[in-house]
From Swiss-Prot:
Subunit structure: Forms a stable energy-coupling factor (ECF) transporter complex composed of 2 membrane-embedded substrate-binding proteins (S component), 2 ATP-binding proteins (A component) and 2 transmembrane proteins (T component). May be able to interact with more than 1 S component at a time.
Known function: Transmembrane (T) component of an energy-coupling factor (ECF) ABC-transporter complex. Unlike classic ABC transporters this ECF transporter provides the energy necessary to transport a number of different substrates.
UniProt keyword Transmembrane helix present: yes
PANTHER family to which the protein is assigned, alphabetical: PROTEIN ABCI12, CHLOROPLASTIC
Membrane topology recorded in Swiss-Prot or TrEMBL: Multi-pass membrane protein
Coiled-coil ranges (or none): none
Family designation: Belongs to the energy-coupling factor EcfT family.
Principal place of residence: membrane
Gene: ecfT
UniProt-recorded name of the protein: Energy-coupling factor transporter transmembrane protein EcfT
Record-annotated membrane-spanning stretches: 26-46, 47-67, 72-92, 107-127, 152-172, 243-263
One cellular-component annotation, GO: plasma membrane
Pfam families: CbiQ
Length: 265
């Protein structure tokens, strides 16, 4: 299941979303995340879902490809849904059997919060799938440039965030390899009680940490060999270009925001 993790991966395709400036995509996603947290009824969530499908169509990515990326975090979504179903009270009583008491408000809140998670994950995943890691680093650095006046290491922060994001699928792949190696030696991580499964995961941690530190060391050596010395005197082979279609795409947030605020009230 871990090998299906797609967050942090880049899929080079020819599409409108791929051509957009990464700074525009980051600002768009940030504002959309704020709007998603403002959603409070089915109409506003419907707007968010329709928007996701439009963006998917414009990025030439299939819905099933994106949906498969949810499987590694499916447990978190189910856990969130169940927590609200059993703990949130209000509305009509749907089930009342012994200690189990499920009310309509809990079901509604559970579905809405789960939808909120899914929309945010879809948006951020589409951004990483359609943005080159180097361009993503440059975009973060460009957006954080005003903080240079506060003597903050903007370039280093941007590089750190980009590397961390890029290492997510790498570490997931490494975890998958270690799990298969352990299972080939007779270890069964899918059977037994919850306590036994947790114990079975512990042998994964040591080789995974060793591999992560080894990859980090190799990356540091490779950067040093290529003469990387931070932002000082660094030039860029490719520069970010803001086009008219980036401005127009960003302006679509105005009617989207107004519509969500109208439906919210």
């Amino acid at each position: 299941m871990l090998d299906k993790m797609i967050l942090g991966r880049f899929v080079p395709l020819q599409s409108f979303v791929h051509r957009l400036d990464p700074r525009m995509k980051m600002v768009f996603v940030f504002i959309m995340m704020i709007l998603i947290f403002l959603m409070n009824n089915w109409q506003t969530y419907a707007v968010g879902i329709i928007l996701i499908f439009i963006i998917l169509k414009a990025s030439n990515l299939s819905f099933m490809f994106l949906f498969n990326g949810l499987k590694p975090i499916l447990f978190l979504l189910i856990f969130t849904l169940l927590m609200h179903i059993f703990l949130t009270k209000g509305g009509a009583t749907l089930v009342d059997y012994g200690i189990i008491n499920i009310q309509s408000q809990g079901v509604i809140m559970g579905i809405m919060i789960s939808l909120r998670f899914i929309l945010i994950i879809f948006l951020t995943t589409i951004m990483t799938l359609t943005t080159n890691p180097i361009e993503l680093t440059d975009a973060i650095e460009s957006l954080l440039k005003p903080f240079k006046k506060l003597k903050l290491p903007v370039h280093e922060l941007a590089l750190m965030m980009s590397i961390a994001l890029r290492f997510i699928p790498t570490l997931m792949d490494e975890t998958q390899k270690v799990m298969k190696a352990q299972m080939s030696r007779g270890s069964d991580m899918t059977a037994g009680t919850l306590k036994e499964r947790i114990k079975a995961v512990i042998p994964l941690l040591v080789p995974l940490f060793v591999s992560a530190f080894k990859r980090a060391e190799d990356l540091a050596i490779a950067m040093e060999v290529r003469g990387y010395k931070g932002d000082a005197g660094r030039t860029k082979y490719r520069k970010l270009d803001w086009h008219t279609y980036d401005t127009l795409s960003l302006l679509t947030l105005i009617p989207i925001t107004l519509l969500i605020l109208y439906l919210k009230n």
